[in-house]
C-alpha cells in the first residue's frame, strides 16, 4: 500500500468514528440509568423481605449492608435469614455507593448518577426509588 492509500483509509475510519461515537454515548448513559433502576428494584425487594421477617426496615445507620450481614446495632433483627438477603451491595453503575435512608419507615434509595453528587438535573440527575 502507498502512503496515500493508508492516509485515505485512516481519514475514512476517522469520519466513521465521528458519526458513530456521538450516537453511542446517549445509549450508554441510558443503559447505566436502567442498570441503576434495576439494582434499586432488587434492593427494594430484599428490603421488603427483611421487613416481612423482622417487622421493620434497617435503620439509616445500618444501611444496605444490613441486607448482606446481620446488623449488630439497634434495632437488631430477631429473625434474620441465614446467609442474608443479598450476597453483596454493588456500587451504582458509575462506581458510587448507593445512599439509603429510612425516614420513619419510608425508604429512600439514591444513586447519585454520573456526577457522584446528590441532586442534579439532566444527565447528572440522581436515580432513586421514587422515579
Over which residues does each language-model region extend?
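Short, surface-exposed interaction loops/tails
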Residues: 26, 30-34, 41, 45-48, ...
Amino acid at each position: 500500500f502507498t502512503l496515500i492509500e493508508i492516509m485515505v483509509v485512516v481519514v475514512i475510519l476517522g469520519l466513521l468514528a465521528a458519526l458513530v461515537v456521538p450516537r453511542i454515548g446517549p445509549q450508554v448513559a441510558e443503559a447505566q440509568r436502567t442498570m441503576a433502576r434495576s439494582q434499586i428494584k432488587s434492593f427494594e425487594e430484599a428490603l421488603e423481605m427483611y421487613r416481612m421477617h423482622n417487622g421493620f426496615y434497617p435503620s439509616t445507620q445500618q444501611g444496605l449492608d444490613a441486607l448482606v450481614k446481620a446488623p449488630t446495632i439497634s434495632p437488631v433483627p430477631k429473625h434474620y435469614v441465614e446467609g442474608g438477603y443479598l450476597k453483596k451491595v454493588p456500587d451504582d453503575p458509575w462506581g458510587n455507593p448507593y445512599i439509603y435512608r429510612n425516614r420513619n419507615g419510608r425508604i429512600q434509595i439514591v444513586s447519585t448518577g454520573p456526577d457522584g453528587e446528590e441532586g442534579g438535573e439532566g444527565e447528572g440527575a440522581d436515580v432513586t426509588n421514587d422515579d
